[in-house]
Amino acid sequence: ASLFHDTNGKKYVVSLEWETREGYEKPGAICMVEYSPEKQEIVGYPKRIWRGGTDRGCIEAPHLTKRGEYYYIMCAEGGTGYNHCVTMGRSQNVWGPYEKDPKNPIVTSVPGESYERQDPDHLKPKYYNPESILQKSGHGSYVELPTGEVYLVHLCSRPFVPELRCTLGRETAIQKMMWTEDNWLRLADGSNFA
């Protein structure tokens, strides 16, 4: 979960809805609820605002930010395996609806599309990409400096081949980003390939 401080003074808790009943997707959706710092409690009931930017499933780690006229939602998708990625959406209303970034995922180690929403194999080694030093790139958050430079910090791994074991576990990477003219976040080279 994360806390979002809007420019109008309101505060929101953004979290993952984890559904445990049979027949429901796990994890399911990103939810948001207003938070009152004076009362130190939530106001009302959580509302589903985002189901993800890809069909990779396993949505988690929501971050909400505001830049200019847009609210941006950034999430991890694809689980923590080789299908891991960072996705983004935006809306002019904090409650949505959020439009998917047309280039989702915005950061990944997996070239091309993958549709694994219902795949029980969370590591997904078939998506290992020998062209990339960084694997399992996902679960990110960005920062914009006063100079206008933008950086994304995200998780990744560097496996030993051919076993594809990552003995150092989840590592941290930082990558330079840029805002496009149409207000989408991209890697500085214009790609989505970590």
Language model segments and positions:
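Carbohydrate-active catalytic/glycan-binding domains of CAZyme proteins
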Residues: 1-194
